[in-house]
């Protein structure tokens, strides 16, 4: 449990891991069980992110991206995540600052630095990392649009995965094998979440 009345759950993983599908199915299940549930995602306020990309694209690097997402995250926490938690909701967030740690570190920023600039962000009660081989994730998403095509190259995604595995090893999140069929992955996630929900 967090210092609030609710429960803050984060789902992490590369695109194609099944985060959003898992989040929606889990939300529906928890609502049926009588919980108040709110789904959200990051990046949150794309006006910040998109404006920076357009105006300062030639200056962009891992450090500028990480700081942009950190500012975006602060708005997200203050305007959406915390208000729902204070009302006793389970908040399911599709990506959080661990995405910045994994992706911006793969771009070249030290992973410890990315974690440092996010150290005062609200800590999740539980973070589940859906681990999928990038080749499988890319195959699952074939033909789908992406907001951030620069993050979809296979060699880059393997670096991202290594960063996620580092975060798992350091105890920041719980790993679920997402290479399997959807129902098996979902059942594991549901079981872990129910074990952590103590109201």
From Swiss-Prot:
Sequence positions that bind ATP: 13-20
Catalytic activity: dTMP + ATP = dTDP + ADP
SUPFAM superfamilies in the record: P-loop containing nucleoside triphosphate hydrolases
The keyword Aminoacyl-tRNA synthetase belongs to this UniProt entry's keyword annotation: no
UniProt keyword list: ATP-binding, Kinase, Nucleotide biosynthesis, Nucleotide-binding, Transferase
GO biological process: dTDP biosynthetic process; dTTP biosynthetic process; dUDP biosynthetic process
Cited HAMAP family: Thymidylate_kinase (MF_00165)
The protein's name: Probable thymidylate kinase
Lineage: Archaea, Thermoproteota, Thermoprotei, Desulfurococcales, Desulfurococcaceae
């Amino acid at each position: 449990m967090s210092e609030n009345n609710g429960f803050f759950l984060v789902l992490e993983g590369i695109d194609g891991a099944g985060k959003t599908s898992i989040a929606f199915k889990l939300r529906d299940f928890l609502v049926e069980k009588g919980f108040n549930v709110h789904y959200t995602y990051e990046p949150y306020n794309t006006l910040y992110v998109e404006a920076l990309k357009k105006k300062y694209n030639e200056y962009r690097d891992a450090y500028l991206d990480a700081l942009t997402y950190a500012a975006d995250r602060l708005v997200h926490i203050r305007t959406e995540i915390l208000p729902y938690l204070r009302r006793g909701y389970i908040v399911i967030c599709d990506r959080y600052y661990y995405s910045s740690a994994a992706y911006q570190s793969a771009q070249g920023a030290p992973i410890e630095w990315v974690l440092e600039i996010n150290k005062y962000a609200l800590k999740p009660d539980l973070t589940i990392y859906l681990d999928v081989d990038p080749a499988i994730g890319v195959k699952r998403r074939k033909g789908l649009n992406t907001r951030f095509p620069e993050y979809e190259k296979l060699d880059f995604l393997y670096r991202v995965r290594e960063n996620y595995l580092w975060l798992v090893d350091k105890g920041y999140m719980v790993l679920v094998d997402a290479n399997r069929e959807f129902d098996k992955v979902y059942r594991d996630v549901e079981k872990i979440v129910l074990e952590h929900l103590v109201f």
